[in-house]
Amino acid sequence: GLASTLGSFLGKFAKGGAQAFLQPK
């Protein structure tokens, strides 16, 4: 459903953001 899709998107976004923050280029 919509909630599941948004949850997955937010999860991926948060994970990517954390990696970028912890491992800056």
From Swiss-Prot:
Record's keyword annotation contains Membrane: no
Keyword Cell division: no
Family note: Belongs to the gastrin/cholecystokinin family.
Entry protein name: Antimicrobial peptide 3
Cited function: Has antibacterial activity against Gram-positive bacterium S.aureus and Gram-negative bacterium E.coli, when in combination with XT1 and XT6.
GO BP: defense response to Gram-negative bacterium; defense response to Gram-positive bacterium
Coiled coil: none
GO CC annotation: extracellular region
Organism: Xenopus tropicalis
Assigned keywords, A-Z: Amphibian defense peptide, Antibiotic, Antimicrobial, Secreted
Cystine residue pairs: none
Tissue-specific expression: Skin.
Subcellular location: Secreted
